[in-house]
Amino acid sequence: MRKIQYLFIALFICLEIQAQDKFNIRGVLPWHNFLSGPTSWNLSDYRIYLDECRKNGINFIGFHNYTGGGERYATYVEPMIKIEYKNILPQACFDNSMTARWGYLPMAVKDFAFDTGKIFQLPVGAEAFGNNGSITSHSSREHYEKAQSLMRDVLKMAHERGIRMAMGFEFGVIPPEYFSLNVAGDCFYWAGESNMIPNPKSQIAAEIHYAAIDDILNTYPDIDYIWMWLNEHSFMGVDVQKALRDKPFARAYQENQALFKEAADSSARFVGVWALEYMKLTYKHLKSKGSRAKLILGGWGGGHQLPSLLKGLDRALPQDIIFSCLNPDLGKSPQPDFLEEIARNRSVWAVPWLEGDHQLWHFQPRVNMMREQVKLAAEQNLDGVIAIHWRTEEPRFNFRTFARFASDKGADESVDQLYDRYLTEEFGEEAAKEMTPLLARMDREQIQWNVPSPEFYAYTPEWGLLDENNVRIRQELVSSGESLL
C-alpha cells in the first residue's frame, strides 16, 4: 500500500514539474482592423487557424473590438460587441474593400488591378473583398447579427480544441452617437483635443459601459475572459483642472491619485484614476451578474501609455484581475522589468508582436525577438504570453518560435538552429544550408525595421523603397534560391 502511495506522490510531482515547463497561458491575439488580418476571415479560415493553434500548443485566443476612438477613429466601431443603449444602435461593420476607414480607397473586386479580381469567389450579390457577413449585410443590425454569429461559432470551435477565449474593448471609448445624450448639469464627458472622454462617475457613462459588458455576456455566454483595454492614445488632451470641477470624480481623484506615484505628471495620474474607476465598475458589474468570466486589463506598452500606471493599478485592484500589456515599440522592445514584481501579486501576461503594423506589406523576421522575449517572460515568472498579429503566412516562423518557447521554458535553440529546422522542413536541406545564415542575420540585425508600409495611413510610393542593405540581402536571398533550381 505504501509503495502505491509513493508511486502516486512521484507521479504528482512529475506532472507538476511538467506543468511548470510551459506557460499556463499560451495565447494568440489576431487583431481586427486591417484586411490583412481576421477582419476578412470567415468560419473556414478560423477553423484552419484554430487547428494550427492547437497543433502548436496554443490554449488561449483573444479578440479586441474597436468601439470608436479619437480623431479619424471616432467612427471606427466593429460589430463583435453591440453597445445598444436607449434604443440607439451605433453604425458598425467589419471593414471590406468598399469601406474607407483605413488608409485605402474603396474598390470593388471587379476593379482590382490586372484582372486579379477573377481569383475571388464572392457570395451572390457581393462586390467587395472581405468577411462574407460584411460584404452581404445591408444594415448595421445585420452587420452585428452576422459578426456575432460568426464569433459564437469561433468560441464553440475554440472550446472544442481546448482553447479558452477572451472578448474585449477599450473602456471609456464609445460610439460617437452617444455623445448627444449629454444632459445639462451632468458631467457625462470631458472635451479632449480630438474626442470626448466619458466620465466614469456619470450615470450615463456607467450605463453605456454596462451595456457593452452585458452584450458580451449575453452574446457569448460561455466566454472565458472579458478583456478591458486602456485606449492606445490614453487621454488625448483633457484639461485636468477643468475635469476636476466634477465633484464625484474629484473625490475619486483625491482618494486615489497617490497610488500612481510612478506616473510622470498630474495628467498621467488623472488617467490612472480614470482607468481605476472604469476597472472597478467592470469588476463590480461582473460580480453582480454572477459571471464566471475572468477579467483582464490590457493596453499599449509605450512610456506614456499603460506601463506607467500598472504599479498604481496593481496596488488598488483585486488580485484576481489579470494584467497584460503589449510590448513597447511595436514589439521591438521587450516587456518592462517591473512586470516581474507585479507577477508576485497576480497573473501577468506579456504580449509580444509577431509583426508590427508599420510594415504589413513586408516580411518581418522576428524569430530572435520571440525567442528572447518569451524566455524573458519565463525568467520574470509571468503566467502567460500572448502573440499579437494580423497576417498568418508571413510571420509563420515567428509564430512557431513563439509557440515553441511558450510550450517549453527550457528550450534553448539558437536563431540559426531554428531557421535551419524551419527551412529544412519546408524547402529541404540544401536550401536551408544556403538561406539560414542570410535569414538569421536579417532577423538578428533587424535591417528591415525602417522600411515603411503602415496600413493605418494611405499608401505612398515610399512603401516600395528599400535602402542598400535591404536590397543587398534580398539579392543574396534570390541568388541563393536560384542556385538551387
Predicted regions and their residues:
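Alpha-helical scaffolding segments of alpha/beta enzyme cores, especially the outer helices
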Residues: 48-51, 146-156, 160, 207, ...
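Structured, solvent-exposed acidic/aromatic patches
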Residues: 241
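Flexible, surface-exposed loop regions and adjacent strand-edge segments
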Residues: 184-186, 244-247
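Bacterial Sec-dependent N-terminal signal peptides
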Residues: 1-19
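Substrate-binding groove of N-acetylhexosamine-processing glycoside hydrolases
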Residues: 42, 76-79, 196, 218, ...
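Short acidic/polar active-site loop segments enriched in Thr and Asp
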Residues: 59, 223-224, 383-384
